[in-house]
């Protein structure tokens, strides 16, 4: 009777010196991260101080450049009157609505290129053509079709993001492992099972990679729509302030827009990390 041989893998535990080295490296990395954060804060404070001092000493014309203190006072007044809060809400909802609709629509459109090769061959030239169209040029048409309210801003943000996500998804579809598809088909898997187990996990990283760009494009689309015609929003605030030559209010809108863009960007980064972790768990399942 033959004895079956089994291979046993042994994992050599880390030495004490190696563990200490890892801890030192981790500690160094934490200190470096704290230093980077502190550097960012100090740089921002230094810019604001230089700006304020320059305005007070007359180095710059505060009629055009205003000053941080005047901008803060104007922002507080606008916030108390609830104008600024609602404008932030309006722009945020327009951006998020267009971003979600564009990402979902682009993902469905891109994945359909795998599901139907005939559809892909028919639609691909139109996808390329529409990608070449400057979407912001469509803003006046969207204003006429959907009015100056919320819908036109969402539609413009949607158009800014849907093609970007679709192209990223198509790139992922083109890089799906065909040998894995063939293997599952040979084992009797249905088409929807191959789609769920092979295609979607392979395409998701490409889709996630487009999210950071899409949130910026969606915000740009919403703002341009507000520039052209809108009753609310940060873009409307900036245009209105410009028409009455209130440069301080213009700076309030610009700074709040910058902060809003930063918050949205980092929120998408955290969403991307969370989805990447769950994608890894899904692949192991």
Task: Describe these PLM feature segments.
Residues 25-33, 57-100:
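Periplasmic/extracellular loop-to-transmembrane helix junction in inner-membrane transport proteins
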Residues 128-164, 171-172:
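Generic hydrophobic transmembrane alpha-helix motif, especially the helices
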Residues 155-159, 192-225, 252:
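Transmembrane alpha-helices
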Residues 97-127:
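Transmembrane-helix boundary motif in ABC transporter permease subunits
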Residues 1-35, 77:
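Membrane-topology segments of multi-pass transport proteins
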Residues 133, 173-179, 183-203, 243:
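Short helix-to-coil transition segments within interhelical loops
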């Amino acid at each position: 009777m033959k004895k079956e041989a089994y291979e046993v893998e042994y994992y050599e535990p880390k030495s004490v010196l190696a563990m200490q080295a890892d801890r030192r490296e981790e500690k160094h990395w934490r200190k470096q991260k704290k230093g980077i954060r502190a550097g960012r804060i100090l740089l921002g404070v230094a810019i604001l101080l230089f700006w304020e001092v320059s305005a007070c000493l007359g180095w710059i014309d505060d009629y055009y450049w205003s000053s941080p203190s005047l901008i803060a006072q104007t922002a507080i007044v606008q916030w108390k009157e609830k104008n600024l809060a609602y404008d932030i809400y309006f722009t945020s909802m327009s951006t998020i609505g267009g971003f979600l609709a564009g990402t979902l629509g682009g993902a469905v459109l891109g994945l359909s290129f795998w599901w139907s090769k005939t559809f892909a061959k028919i639609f691909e030239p139109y996808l390329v053509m529409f990608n070449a169209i400057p979407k912001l040029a469509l803003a006046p048409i969207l204003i006429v079709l959907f009015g100056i309210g919320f819908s036109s801003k969402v539609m413009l943000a949607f158009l800014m993001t849907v093609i970007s996500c679709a192209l990223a998804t198509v790139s992922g579809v083109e890089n799906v492992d065909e040998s894995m598809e063939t293997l599952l088909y040979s084992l009797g898997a249905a088409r929807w099972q191959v789609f769920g187990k092979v295609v979607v996990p392979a395409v998701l990283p490409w889709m996630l990679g487009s999210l950071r760009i899409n949130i910026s494009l969606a915000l740009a689309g919403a703002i341009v729509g507000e520039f052209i015609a809108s009753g609310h929003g940060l873009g409307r605030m900036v245009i209105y302030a410009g028409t009455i030559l209130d440069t301080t209010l213009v700076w309030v809108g610009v700074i709040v827009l910058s902060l809003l863009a930063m918050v949205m960007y980092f929120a998408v980064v955290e969403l991307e990390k969370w989805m990447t972790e769950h994608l890894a768990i899904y692949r192991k399942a």
